[in-house]
Amino acid sequence: MKRGHEPKPAFGGAGEAGPGVMAERPLVPACPTGRPGRLQRHLLSGEFDQLRDFRIFESNFVQVTRLGEVANKVTMGVAASSPALELPDLLLLAGPAKENGHLQLFGLFPLQFVQLFVHDESRWQLKVKFRTGRAFYLQLRAPPESRDREFGQWVRLLYRLRFHSAQGAVPFTQDYSALEDDEDDDEDEDRDLPAGELQAMEARLDPQMSELWGL
């Protein structure tokens, strides 16, 4: 993975420091032109008035199984519910509707109920796990020339969410194997479960099956 990039514009794409901005090496929206991403544009469409003002860091993924098989397309983003927050506190999940393929928001969850892991760096994969035990795997969909940089932004975000303190976040230049180690421990627990239970815990993201979230 490429490291040591220059500091990026502010979280949410403002490009300047301001309320809610992450102080050190802030993240930027995953759209190289600075144009709002699909999820941001969807929220601006007027259907979700309470979410219109959220600044979102988002990327496009495909959901994959533990064996790497592609299940469906997913857009995942994080947002801060208040400009006073230094870090995002909400996770948003969206995907194409079965009827017309238009983007559909089918999950908004407090990040306190979610764990994010680096699942496979070489394949740009993250693992998302809820406190209920439900888990799924997402592989980044991005142009080859920007994929490493964009995945690196998610890794930095994971660090901030995991290690942020009143004194500031842990520097992102350090090795992030700790994130992978935590995920490995979680995988060891999974291996002790019968195959049927493992399959039941691996959630398929489907806007028509909201009961999968259990939240």
Swiss-Prot record:
Keywords: Golgi apparatus. It is found in: Golgi apparatus. Residues 178-191 have a biased composition (Acidic residues). Residues 1-20, 174-215 are annotated as: Disordered. GO terms for cellular component: Golgi apparatus. Signal peptide: none annotated. InterPro entries: GARIL-like_Rab2B-bd (IPR022168). GO terms for biological process: defense response to virus; innate immune response; positive regulation of type I interferon production. Pfam families: GARIL_Rab2_bd. Coiled coil: none annotated. Belongs to the GARIN family. Interacts (via N-terminus) with RAB2B (in GTP-bound form). RAB2B effector protein which promotes cytosolic DNA-induced innate immune responses. Regulates IFN responses against DNA viruses by regulating the CGAS-STING signaling axis. This is Golgi-associated RAB2 interactor protein 5A. The gene is GARIN5A.
